[in-house]
Every structure is written in structure tokens, then in C-alpha cells.
A protein has these predicted regions:
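Active-site-adjacent pocket-lining segments in enzyme domains
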Residues: 1-87
Length: 87
């Protein structure tokens, strides 16, 4: 889930006791999860990201989870995390 989509996960009960991230301010509407202000957060089979500016980091994480070579993609596209987090 990316941007404000974790609200839907919250409403479905998916975020209970799970770490997540989302668009700034959205976390105030979510009471069950454990908010972390990071570019991408993975907790088990749940992957969340902060918003449109983090879409590439989110995509690279999904590629890695599916067994792809995310690092080669990062290098090839000269990717640099917009928030300065290590990915």
C-alpha cells in the first residue's frame, strides 16, 4: 500500500500490530498499526510506502520480494532515495 492506502488496510483490520508508513498526516487516522516515518516499511507480507515521491523505492522493494534484481535496477536508473534513507 502506498500514500493514503493504509487507511483501507486499517479499516480492514490488516494493520493491527503491524509496522507501516504512509503519506504524512494520514497516520493520525490509523490507530491499530505502528507508524514509522520511513520511505518503505516491510512487516511480514505487508509492504507500505509514503507516497508518489517514493514510488520507485516501493517498486524496487516489490521487485526484490518477487526475486528480481532490484539493486541492478537502482544502479541502472541512478536511483537516490528522496528522503536519504538507505534502501
Amino acid at each position: 500500500a502506498i500514500c493514503a492506502a493504509p487507511i483501507a488496510l486499517h479499516q480492514a483490520g490488516v494493520l493491527k500490530d503491524k509496522r507501516f508508513t504512509c503519506y504524512d498526516g494520514v497516520q493520525e487516522q490509523i490507530t491499530d498499526g505502528i507508524y514509522q516515518k520511513e520511505t518503505v516499511v516491510v512487516d511480514g507480507n505487508l509492504t507500505t510506502s509514503r507516497g508518489p515521491s517514493t514510488a520507485l523505492a516501493f517498486a524496487y522493494e516489490l521487485v526484490a520480494q518477487l526475486g528480481g534484481d532490484a539493486e541492478s535496477l537502482r544502479v541502472g536508473m541512478l536511483y537516490r532515495d528522496v528522503f536519504g534513507n538507505q534502501q
